[in-house]
C-alpha cells in the first residue's frame, strides 16, 4: 500500500510544504535530540486510567510488545505508546482530515484546508463511528484515553514541530480514530486526482485525442465513448478553480494522502510450499522518505493475541497474525469516487445548479477557518445532489462550471467492527465472513491459515447508469448518475485455487468484461506477472519469499524487446535508425543492441538498467512533450501524475498503439510514425546518459540516477539544515514494475518516489511463523533510538522474527521492559 514523496509544485513554504511540516512522519526537535521527549524503555511509571500493571518491551526495531491482564489496559497502553512514538503524525493527520492545518501552519495551508472541508471526511467519520457497535465505541474510547494520558504527561515535552508552532493539541476523541480511518480510505482513492488530471489534459487536447492519454489496461479498448462526454464543452477557464484543485490534489498525492499507488500481497498454498504449510507475504508501500506511516505492534491479553501493522491513531491491526490466521491488505485501486461537472448560476449569495433542464438551489453551509497569525475567515461551502462543490481557493463558484465530488455514504457501515473481528478470526472461512463486512475501504484482503488461503475484495462500488468514471460527468444529465451499489456477494474472491497461490499487486484482478465495474484505474500488470513467474517456478519457503520481496527483475523489458522484434516493427525501426544523422545513428544502434541483450534485472549497479530507464524517460518526452509540454506545464504534470498512480499512456504507447496521433511530432513539418520516434528515443537515451553519467557507458549505474532519499519531509527540519533529521541518499534498484518497487516519476526525474514501507511474512511451517521489517523506524522522533534505525537492516533484508509464543518473548524482545502501573 501505499499509500503513501514530496514533489516540488510550490516554493518550499507553500501549501505543500506547510502540510508536509505537520504531516511529516518525523518529529522535529529544536535545539538537539531531547531525550525528555521520548518514552522510556525501562522503569516503572504510574499512569492514571490503568486498572492493572502493563508491561511494554521493545525488540531491535522498536516494535512494542504490550502484555496486559485485560484488553482494556492493552488498548489504553496502545494509545499511550502510539502517541509516544508518533504524536506529530497523529495530530497532523487529524488536522488534515478536519481541514484545520492552517491553525498550526498558517495561511500557507489554507487551500489544503478548503479542499478538505469540502471533501468533508468529518461526516464520513461520523457515519462510520455512529454505525459501529457499542463494543467498538468502548474500544475507541479506551484507546483515546491512552492517547490523552500521553498528551497530559508530555504536555510540556511535546516534539518541537508542535511546540514551536504555538499550537495547543486538543485531547483525542474516540471519533478521531474513525477520522484517521476515513483519511486512510481517502488516501487509497486515486479517482479524484486522476479525474482532475484528466480534465487538465482535456483543456490541452481535443476529446478525440484525449482517450489516447487515458488507457485502462493493455488489453482494454481506449475510452473514446468516455471522452465524448466532454465534447462540445468549453473547458478552458470555465471550470471554477480547476488549476487550484489540481495543484492541491497533486500536493496531497505527494503527501501520501491521495492515490497511494502500490502494495503487494500474496499467499502460497500448502501444495506449493516446500514444507507443506501455507505462507503469506505482505509488502506495504508508501512514498519514500522518513518515516513510514506504518508501524508494528504486538498485543498479548486474555482472549486477544495479535502481532501486526497499525497506523498511529487507530486501535486496529490492519494486517497481521493472531497465531492461527494471517491477513494482509493491498489497494484494489477501486473506483468509488466520481467528479461531476455542474452548470452553476450565481445570483448574489444564491447559487443554483442545473438538473435535467431545471435550476435547483444548491445547499449551503458556513465554514470558519481559524488561521494562525490571521483573522478568522468565514466561507460558504455549496452542495449539489452529487456532493459538495470542491474548492481550493478563495474564489467562490460563479456562472459557469464547477466540480462536485460524489462518494459512498457509510451510515450503515460496519467496517470498523469488521476489522476488529478479522483480527480475531481463527481461520480462512471466518476471515471471508468478516472481510465481506468491510465496505468503507477498497482493499484486496489476502489471508491464510496453515492449510488454506483466500482472497476477498472489499469496498462499496457504485453502479453507474452510463460512463466509466475516468472523466468528470455532466452533472446536469441524470444518465450518468449512480444507481445504488454492487452487492458485496458479487465482489471478487477466491479460495484455495488450483494454481496454488493468490496474489494482488494493484493489477486488474478480475477478467476482462467482469460483470461489475470495479475500477478503470488499475496499476501496471508487471509486478503481478513477476509474482506468477516466481510462484510457479518451484516450491516456496521463507527464504524464497524474502527473495521475492527483494526481487528487482521487470517483465516490461521482455515486452519491450518483443515490440522491437515484431514483424511490423523490426524493419521500419532499423530504417528509422539508419535515417538518423550519423552521431544519433551510432547512439541509437548502441542503445538498441544493449536493450535487446538486457535481462530485465534492475540492480542499482547495472549499466544496462540505467540505459533501459533512460530510454523509458526519453521515450515519454519524445512521444508526448511536443503537445503536452513544456515540462513545467499543468498538462505535463498531469500526465506524469497519472503515470505514478495507474497504468499509463507512456507504457501503453511503447507496447502498442501504433496508430496513435501522438507519434507525430507536431513541431516538425513532416509526419513522424512510431519507428521514427523510437529511433529518436534510443539516441536520446545515450545523449541523456552521457550528460548525467559520463561518456564511459560501461561504468553507468542505475543507482547513480535512482536513489532513496532518507530525508524528513518537514520544511522545519530543512530550515534547520536537515542534520539530525535526515539520513542521506542511497543508491537503489528497481522501478514501478518490480516487486521490490521503487517507482520514479515517468517523464520527470529518477529519484525513488515510491518504496515499500513495511514487510511481513508468515510461514506456518515454522515454530515462530511471523517475521517482519520496517523501512525506516518505529519512532518519528529523532531523539529516539528507534528513529531511522531500520534503514540499514532494510537494505540488507535482515528480517526480525516476531514470536507469538510466550516462552520465546525474551529471545525476541529481551528482558528490559517498561512497567506502567495504575496511577491515582
Swiss-Prot record:
One protein family per Pfam: Penicil_amidase
Domain of life: Bacteria
Family listed: Belongs to the peptidase S45 family.
Alphabetic keyword roster: Hydrolase, Periplasm, Quorum sensing, Signal, Zymogen
Known function: Catalyzes the deacylation of acyl-homoserine lactone (AHL or acyl-HSL), releasing homoserine lactone (HSL) and the corresponding fatty acid. Possesses a specificity for the degradation of long-chain acyl-HSLs (side chains of seven or more carbons in length).
Localization per record: Periplasm
Protein name: Acyl-homoserine lactone acylase QuiP
Signal peptide (residue range): 1-26
EC number: 3.5.1.97
Source organism of the structure: Pseudomonas syringae pv. syringae (strain B728a)
Active site: 264
PANTHER family cross-referenced by the UniProt entry: ACYL-HOMOSERINE LACTONE ACYLASE QUIP, PEPTIDASE S45 PENICILLIN AMIDASE
Top class in the EC scheme: hydrolase
Subunit structure: Heterodimer of an alpha subunit and a beta subunit processed from the same precursor.
Keyword Cell inner membrane part of the UniProt annotation: no
Amino acid at each position: 500500500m501505499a499509500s503513501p514523496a514530496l514533489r516540488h509544485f510550490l516554493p518550499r513554504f507553500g501549501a505543500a510544504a506547510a502540510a508536509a511540516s505537520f504531516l511529516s512522519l518525523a518529529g522535529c526537535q529544536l535545539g538537539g535530540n531531547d531525550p525528555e521527549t521520548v518514552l522510556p524503555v525501562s522503569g516503572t511509571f504510574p499512569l492514571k486510567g490503568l486498572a492493572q500493571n502493563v508491561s511494554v518491551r521493545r525488540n531491535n526495531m522498536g516494535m512494542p510488545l504490550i502484555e496486559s491482564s485485560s484488553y482494556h489496559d492493552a488498548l489504553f497502553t496502545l494509545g499511550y505508546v502510539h502517541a509516544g512514538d508518533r504524536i506529530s503524525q497523529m495530530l497532523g493527520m487529524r488536522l488534515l482530515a478536519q481541514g484545520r492545518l492552517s491553525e498550526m501552519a498558517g495561511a500557507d495551508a489554507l487551500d489544503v484546508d478548503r479542499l478538505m472541508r469540502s471533501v468533508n471526511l468529518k461526516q464520513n467519520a461520523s457515519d462510520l463511528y455512529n454505525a459501529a457497535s457499542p463494543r467498538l465505541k468502548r474500544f475507541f474510547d479506551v484507546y483515546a484515553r491512552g492517547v490523552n494520558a500521553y498528551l497530559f504527561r508530555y504536555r510540556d515535552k511535546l516534539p518541537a514541530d508542535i511546540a514551536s508552532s504555538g499550537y495547543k493539541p486538543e485531547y483525542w476523541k474516540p471519533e478521531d480514530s474513525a477520522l484517521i480511518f476515513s483519511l486512510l480510505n481517502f488516501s487509497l482513492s486515486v479517482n479524484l486526482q486522476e479525474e482532475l488530471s484528466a480534465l487538465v489534459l482535456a483543456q490541452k487536447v481535443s476529446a478525440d485525442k484525449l482517450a489516447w492519454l487515458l488507457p485502462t489496461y493493455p488489453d482494454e479498448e481506449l475510452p473514446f465513448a468516455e471522452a465524448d462526454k466532454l465534447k462540445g464543452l468549453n473547458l478552458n477557464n470555465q471550470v471554477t478553480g480547476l488549476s487550484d484543485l489540481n495543484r492541491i490534489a497533486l500536493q496531497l498525492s505527494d503527501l501520501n494522502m491521495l492515490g497511494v499507488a502500490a502494495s503487494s500481497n500474496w499467499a502460497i498454498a500448502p501444495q506449493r510450499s516446500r514444507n507443506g504449510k501455507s505462507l503469506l507475504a505482505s509488502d506495504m508501500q508508501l512514498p519514500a522518505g522518513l518515516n513510514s506511516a506504518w508501524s508494528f505492534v504486538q498485543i498479548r491479553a486474555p482472549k486477544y493475541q495479535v502481532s501486526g501493522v497499525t497506523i498511529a491513531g487507530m486501535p486496529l491491526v490492519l494486517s497481521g497474525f493472531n497465531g492461527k490466521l494471517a491477513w494482509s491488505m493491498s489497494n484494489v485501486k477501486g473506483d468509488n469516487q466520481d467528479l461531476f461537472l455542474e452548470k452553476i448560476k450565481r445570483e448574489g449569495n444564491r447559487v443554483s445548479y442545473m438538473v435535467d433542464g431545471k435550476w435547483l438551489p444548491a445547499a449551503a453551509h458556513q465554514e470558519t477557518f481559524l488561521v494562525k497569525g490571521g483573522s478568522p475567515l468565514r466561507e460558504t461551502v455549496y452542495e449539489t445532489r452529487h456532493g459538495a462543490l470542491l474548492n481550493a481557493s478563495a474564489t467562490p463558484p460563479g456562472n459557469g462550471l464547477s466540480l462536485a465530488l460524489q462518494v459512498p455514504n457509510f451510515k450503515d457501515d460496519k467496517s470498523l467492527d469488521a476489522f476488529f473481528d478479522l483480527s480475531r478470526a481463527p481461520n480462512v472461512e471466518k476471515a471471508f465472513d468478516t472481510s465481506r463486512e468491510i465496505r468503507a475501504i477498497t482493499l484486496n484482503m489476502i489471508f491464510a491459515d496453515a492449510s488454506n488461503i483466500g482472497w476477498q475484495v472489499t469496498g462499496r462500488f457504485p453502479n453507474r447508469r452510463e460512463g466509466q468514471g475516468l472523466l468528470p460527468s455532466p452533472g446536469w444529465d441524470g444518465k450518468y448518475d449512480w444507481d445504488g451499489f454492487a452487492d458485496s456477494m458479487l465482489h471478487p474472491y477466491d479460495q484455495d485455487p488450483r494454481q496454488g497461490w493468490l496474489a494482488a499487486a494493484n493489477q486488474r484482478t478480475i477478467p476482462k468484461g467482469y460483470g461489475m465495474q470495479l475500477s478503470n484505474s488499475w496499476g501496471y500488470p508487471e509486478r503481478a506477472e513477476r509474482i506468477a513467474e516466481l510462484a510457479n517456478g518451484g516450491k516456496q519457503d521463507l527464504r524464497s519469499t524474502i527473495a521475492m520481496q527483494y526481487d528487482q527483475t521487470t517483465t516490461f523489458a521482455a515486452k519491450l524487446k518483443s515490440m522491437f522484434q515484431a514483424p511490423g516493427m523490426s524493419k521500419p525501426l532499423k530504417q528509422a535508425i539508419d535515417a538518423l544523422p550519423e552521431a544519433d545513428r551510432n547512439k541509437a544502434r548502441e542503445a538498441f543492441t544493449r536493450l535487446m541483450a538486457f535481462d530485465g534485472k534492475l540492480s542499482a549497479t547495472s549499466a544496462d538498467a540505467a540505459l533501459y530507464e533512460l530510454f523509458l524517460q526519453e521515450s515519454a518526452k519524445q512521444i508526448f512533450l511536443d503537445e503536452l509540454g513544456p515540462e513545467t506545464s499543468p498538462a505535463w504534470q498531469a500526465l506524469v501524475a497519472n503515470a505514478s498512480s495507474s497504468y499509463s499512456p507512456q507504457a501503453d504507447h511503447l507496447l502498442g498503439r501504433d496508430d496513435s496521433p501522438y507519434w507525430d511530432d507536431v513541431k516538425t513539418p513532416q509526419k513522424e510514425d512510431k519507428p521514427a520516434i523510437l529511433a529518436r528515443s534510443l539516441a536520446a537515451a545515450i545523449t541523456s546518459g552521457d550528460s548525467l553519467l559520463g561518456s564511459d557507458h560501461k561504468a553507468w549505474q542505475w543507482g547513480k540516477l535512482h536513489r532513496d532519499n532518507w530525508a524528513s519531509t518537514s520544511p522545519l527540519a530543512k530550515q534547520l539544515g536537515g542534520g539530525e533529521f535526515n539520513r542521506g541518499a542511497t543508491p537503489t534498484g528497481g522501478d514501478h514494475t518490480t516487486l521490490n518497487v521503487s517507482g520514479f516519476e515517468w517523464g520527470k526525474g529518477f529519484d525513488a518516489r515510491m518504496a515499500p514501507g513495511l514487510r511481513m511474512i508468515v510461514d506456518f511451517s515454522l515454530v515462530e511463523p511471523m517475521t517482519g521489517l520496517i523501512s525506516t523506524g518505529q519512532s518519528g522522533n529523532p531523539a529516539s533510538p528507534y528513529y531511522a534505525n531500520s534503514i540499514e537492516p532494510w537494505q540488507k533484508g535482515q528480517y526480525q522474527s516476531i514470536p507469538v509464543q510466550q516462552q520465546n518473548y525474551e529471545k525476541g524482545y529481551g528482558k528490559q521492559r517498561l512497567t506502567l502501573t495504575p496511577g491515582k
